[in-house]
Every structure is written in C-alpha cells, then in structure tokens.
C-alpha cells in the first residue's frame, strides 16, 4: 500500500500540473496547525517566484481543481498562498479497511530486494558481570534488528563477545595464583583436560576485577598477564582449554541475562573467532603496500584530502606484534564477508568510539576487505545517566549490575500492579500472575525508557518516571493495549464474532475517531523511516501518539453500549487494528503486553 501522505501528494501534484505549474510544487506535509487542517501544501509560495504571480492566485486555482476530489473533505486556499487539506472520512475508512486486510503488514510493503544485514551488538567482555552500561547496545541493537526483519531483510545478530586480549591473560594469571596446582598450568601435561570448569561464574566474576586491580598497582603481575595473553594467543594448550571453560561458563550466564532482556542472537561469536584470519590479512596489507611501519607499529594511513580534522592511522599491530581492537574488528569483517557476505554491517557501540570506527571502516575499504557495495554503519549511543546527570551508579557510588537494576524495577512494578488491583477492588490475579505481569511491564519500562530517546543522546534513567502508568512510558503503552484487549474480550463474551469483521470500518462519526484513523495511517511511513535511520525512538513517538489518539477516542465514544450494531462493529474493527499495530510496534521494540494489568 502507498503511504497516505504520498497518495495525497500525488493528487495535489496532478492538480498543480493541470493548473499549468511544475509538479515539484505539489509536495504535501502534515499540518503544523492541526486546529485548522490535517495536511498542508506550501508549494504555491515557492511557485509564485517562478511564475511571477501572487501565491494565492496559484493556490486558488489548485484548490478549485481539488474541490470535487473524493479523497478530500475540503481543500482550502488560504492567503498568502497555503493549501489547507482535510481528509474525506469515507476515503479514510477505506484506507483503514485496506490496512486491516493486509494482515501482519498493515499497508507496509516488504523490501523488494532483501538485504543481508549483520548487527554487531558489541557484546561485553566474558567473565565480567553485566552492568548497566551493557544495557544500551543490547536494547538498541535488538530493536534495530527486529525493525529490519519486519521490513523483510535477512538479519543476523552477533553478540560479538570480548574474549581476546589482555583480560584473558589477567584471568589466567589470577587463577594461577589462586589454584597453581591446576593441570592447565603444567606445560609438560599431554593428556585430556577436565570437562568441568575449575571455577563457577561467581568465582569468575570475582577473579577479573581482582586481577584488573592488581595489574594497575603490581607491575610484575601485569607483565605475567601480558605473557599469559601472548602464550594464549600463541596456542598454548592449557590456556586454550581454560579459554574454552571461561567461554562456556560465561556464555551460559550471558544467555540467561540476555533472555531476561528478551534479546536473542543468531551468532554467539567472539573476538577469538576472528583470530585465525589475522595473519593472512596482515600479510595481504603488507604485500599490497597498504601497511607500513610507523614508530615501531604496523599501520595503515586512512586520512583523506577532505578531512577537516586529523584522522590518525589505523594501527594493525603494536610494536610487540600484539593485535588491537582494530585488528580484531578488521579480521571479523574478513570472516563476515566470507561467511555471510553482508550488504550492511551495523555496529552498536558508545558514541565516544566514533574515531575507532572511522579508522576501521576506512581501512576496510582501502584494503579491499569490504567492497563499496557493503555499507558499514556505526550507531553511536549516548550515556545512561542518573538523576544527577552523571553516569548511573549504585547508592554507594559503584557501577550497578544489570540484573540488580532489573530486579529493582521488577519489584517497583509489582508493587504498583498490586496497588492498582486494590484500587480497582479486583483481587482475582494470583501472586504468580502478578509477578509475571510485573516482569513483562518492567521490561517495557526499561526498554521504552531507553528507546524513546534518540540513540545518540545521553538520557536520565529515572525509575519513578519509567514505571509510571501515565505519560510517555512503556507501562502507559501496555495499559492502553490491555484496555483494548479488555473491550474486545467483553465484546466476544456478549456473543460478538471478531473474526467475522470484514471491511467493517465505517466513516468516522466524531473527531476522536478520525484522529485515531489518521494516527493509524502513519504506520507504514513511521516504520520505513525508523528502518532507514536506525531510529527506534521514532516508533516510540508514534505509539505514544497512537495510544493518546485511542484513549481520546475511547473517552469520547460509547463503544460496547452503541445501539447501532454496524457502528459497533466498525468501532470494534478499528480497535482490533489499533491493538495489532501497537503489538507489532512493541514487538519491534523488543517487549510484549500482558493480557491483564
């Protein structure tokens, strides 16, 4: 289906051409004065300069040609030369029925040429506790992936774990100090290593911060960790076996954490998976003259003549021959081109890493790792701050673990749901259902609270505001969906057959209903825009508008008590469409709605 605003623009453009003016002046936009009209066209103002006449003379001619068009209730020419447009309610009702008939798509066409897209979530380092800083890449990445999938693309989500580099050497060195008799440290050992890990996830999460702290104050410990890292990367058997244990224990815990966030990956690869591609890649860069030595390091120059600021070379190998994040990211691209051949690779990472990605992307193109046809995108996100405007911390000033934050919000939501039930004197929800509902609503509170902000912006993580049932929040959106579900359930309980409602939506009978229809009609344009700009916040803004439009209609209209059966069916059919579109949108945001709240 064509977007409503495009259909309107086509009609207005035809009128401009028929009146003798260029088609470029027929573009229609949403009205900036919704109290006067629903859409507007300002083309006559620009056309007046070209055709050397008063703007209102042009707008008068165009309005006269559109006067009898069945698409419009009215097209008014307003001085100095604006066209104020109101939609015909019958045309709008037909558009609603067409959206409803397009089951699961609601007027949004799938991509004609599906792309293969890899979404790199920039996952956490293994063996480290997940903290609130890991929230944004997971939540934004999952939504970006789901939006692209809804558009019909083949999307591959890769957690991209940090499982290579100094942190692994730190863990091995600290483990050796704690448990020196483990067989993994005996270089003469040639047998099979134990299948069970010599540590639990709790031990592992204590080992890394302890080791990291030691490396900053104990130079000999740091040297030992650097050596362990080099030996691990050089293929030392015992260390490779330990890496396997670290990965297995960490990934099991990670999967549980990500499951709680309703975040899922098609690939569970780490930086270590790309390491086999490094030697050949480095050799290629040397042979083709892309890489050269600079101050002991192997680098590729990536500056361009058009640069307005200094872009340092991309370092491929340090002076001691060790690889860096840039090396790993480039080798990962080599691997992805070979295994997935993507048309686009999207990276989720802190906005402060933008220089790193400029260097890596330019190096990948210059060296031919990726062709010009493969798009490389960095979605740089801002910081999640506390109410004081500083990075979110625990009450004692530490970095808050993600699972503790989610538990705090679950508890807050459970209390609010119980209070809500008492106020309604509706105590028929048992404890188990209340707890599950609280988890569902809490997840919506967290995700919507994050995603409703433009990704690149810092935002304040305000638990009180995010868990509110009023205002621009996840719980408010879910409450709206639950309200619609309740009305539909009552309709069916009284013998109504929702499945039999075909082309049942009739022209709007009040302003609230028309406003709801106009909001619904923006669905395909909104999702397209959210996909093209990798902007989940646009979907949040849309469903907040849609929820408000529904609630306005609900308060102005007697739905179930309507005596005219055809009109009642029209209302119910419109509610079904509203519910389905809201549910499709929240699914793209990565959460769902309960049946009751």
What are the language-model segments listed below?
Residues 100-112:
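Flexible, low-complexity linker/hinge segments
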Residues 1-93, 111-597:
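Non-catalytic interaction-recognition regions
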Residues 94-99:
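Short, charged, solvent-exposed linker or helix-capping segments at domain edges/interfaces
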């Amino acid at each position: 289906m064509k977007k409503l605003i495009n259909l309107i623009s086509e009609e207005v453009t035809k009128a401009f051409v028929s009146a003798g003016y260029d088609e470029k002046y027929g573009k229609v936009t949403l009205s900036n004065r919704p109290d006067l009209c629903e859409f507007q066209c300002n083309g006559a103002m620009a056309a007046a300069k070209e055709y050397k006449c008063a703007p209102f003379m042009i707008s008068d001619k165009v309005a006269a040609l559109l006067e009898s068009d069945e698409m419009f209730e009215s097209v008014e020419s307003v001085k100095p030369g604006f066209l104020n447009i109101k939609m015909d309610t019958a045309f709008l009702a037909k558009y609603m029925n067409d959206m409803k008939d397009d089951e699961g798509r609601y007027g949004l066409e799938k991509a004609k040429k599906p792309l293969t897209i890899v979404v790199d979530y920039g996952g956490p380092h293994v063996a480290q506790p997940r903290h609130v800083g890991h929230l944004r890449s997971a939540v934004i990445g999952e939504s970006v992936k789901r939006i692209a999938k809804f558009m019909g693309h083949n999307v591959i989500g890769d957690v991209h774990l940090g499982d290579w580099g100094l942190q692994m050497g730190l863990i091995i060195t600290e483990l050796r100090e704690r448990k020196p008799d483990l067989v993994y440290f005996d270089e003469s050992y040639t047998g099979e290593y134990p299948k069970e890990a010599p540590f639990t996830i709790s031990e592992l999460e204590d080992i890394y911060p302890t080791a990291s702290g030691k490396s900053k104050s104990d130079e000999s410990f740091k040297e030992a960790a650097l050596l362990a890292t080099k030996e691990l990367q050089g293929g030392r058997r015992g260390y490779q076996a330990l890496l396997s244990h670290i990965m297995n224990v960490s990934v099991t815990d990670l999967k549980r954490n990500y499951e709680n966030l309703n975040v899922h990956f098609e690939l569970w690869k780490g930086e270590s998976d790309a390491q086999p591609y490094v030697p050949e890649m480095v050799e290629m860069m040397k042979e083709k003259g892309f890489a050269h030595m600079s101050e002991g390091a192997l680098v590729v120059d990536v500056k361009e003549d058009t640069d307005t600021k200094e872009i340092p070379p991309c370092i491929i190998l340090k002076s001691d021959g060790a690889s860096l994040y840039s090396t790993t990211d480039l080798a990962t691209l080599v691997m992805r081109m070979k295994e997935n051949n993507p048309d686009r690779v999207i990276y989720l990472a802190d906005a402060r890493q933008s220089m790193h990605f400029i260097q890596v992307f330019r190096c990948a193109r210059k060296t031919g790792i990726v062709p010009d046809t493969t798009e490389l995108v960095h979605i740089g996100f801002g910081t999640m701050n506390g109410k004081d405007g500083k990075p979110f911390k625990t009450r004692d000033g530490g970095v808050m673990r993600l699972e503790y934050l989610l538990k705090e919000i679950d508890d807050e939501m459970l209390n609010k749901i119980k209070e809500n039930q008492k106020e309604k004197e509706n105590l028929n929800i048992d404890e188990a259902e209340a707890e599950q509902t609280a988890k569902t609503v809490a997840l919506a509170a967290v995700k919507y609270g994050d995603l409703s902000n433009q990704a690149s912006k810092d935002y304040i993580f305000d638990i009180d505001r995010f868990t509110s049932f009023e205002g621009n929040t996840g719980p408010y959106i879910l409450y709206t969906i639950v309200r619609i579900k309740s009305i539909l359930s009552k309709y069916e309980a009284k013998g109504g057959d929702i499945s039999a409602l075909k082309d049942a939506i009739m022209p709007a009978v009040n302003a609230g209903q028309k406003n709801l229809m106009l909001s619904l009609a923006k669905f395909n344009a909104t999702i397209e825009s959210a996909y093209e700009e990798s902007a989940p916040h646009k979907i949040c803004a849309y469903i907040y508008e849609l929820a408000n439009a529904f609630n306005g209609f609900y308060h102005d209209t007697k739905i179930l008590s309507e005596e005219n059966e055809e009109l009642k069916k029209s209302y119910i059919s419109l509610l079904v469409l509203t519910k389905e579109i809201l549910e499709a949108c929240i699914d793209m945001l990565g959460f769902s709605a309960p049946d009751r709240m």
